[in-house]
Amino acid sequence: MGQCRSANAEDAQEFSDVERAIETLIKNFHKYSVAGKKETLTPAELRDLVTQQLPHLMPSNCGLEEKIANLGNCNDSKLEFGSFWELIGEAAKSVKMERPVTRS
């Protein structure tokens, strides 16, 4: 995959719904990565992000601690965006569509 360009306000109109959703995920990842590098989250930062931003898709009683412990390379207690993306994929699996979305 190619590199993603950063969007500014005027470009946002051109983005599809999915592109805006991905941009929102990236912004939230960086918003919660306060300790150390912006490219990684500590397990505590990831826990905060998930409990505050995904309370309905991934409630705290769903084995969140185990999922965080099993993500990526936890040797240095830093999780990269790919690990966050993996967790988002797990949360997305719980979403059930009532009916297929039709394209217009």
Curated annotation (Swiss-Prot):
Q: Which InterPro entries match?
A: EF-hand-dom_pair (IPR011992), S100_Ca-bd_sub (IPR013787)
What GO terms fall under cellular component here? perinuclear region of cytoplasm
Q: Which residues form the EF-hand domain?
A: 27-61
Protein's GO biological process: apoptotic process; defense response to bacterium; positive regulation of granulocyte chemotaxis; positive regulation of monocyte chemotaxis; response to lipopolysaccharide; toll-like receptor 4 signaling pathway
Q: Which UniProt keywords apply?
A: Apoptosis, Cytoplasm, Repeat
Q: Where in the cell is it found?
A: Cytoplasm
List the cysteine pairs that form cystine.
Answer: none
Report which superkingdom the organism of origin falls in: Eukaryota
What's a Gene Ontology MF term here?
A: chemokine receptor binding
Keyword Mitochondrion set for record: no
Subunit composition and interactions = Homodimer. Interacts with AGER.
Function, in words: Modulates P53/TP53 protein levels, and thereby plays a role in the regulation of cell survival and apoptosis. Depending on the context, it can promote cell proliferation or apoptosis. Plays a role in the regulation of cell migration by modulating the levels of MMP2, a matrix protease that is under transcriptional control of P53/TP53. Does not bind calcium.
Q: Which PANTHER family match?
A: PROTEIN S100-A14 (PTHR11639:SF4), S100 CALCIUM-BINDING PROTEIN (PTHR11639)
Q: What is this protein called?
A: Protein S100-A14
Q: What is the lineage of its organism?
A: Eukaryota, Metazoa, Chordata, Craniata, Vertebrata
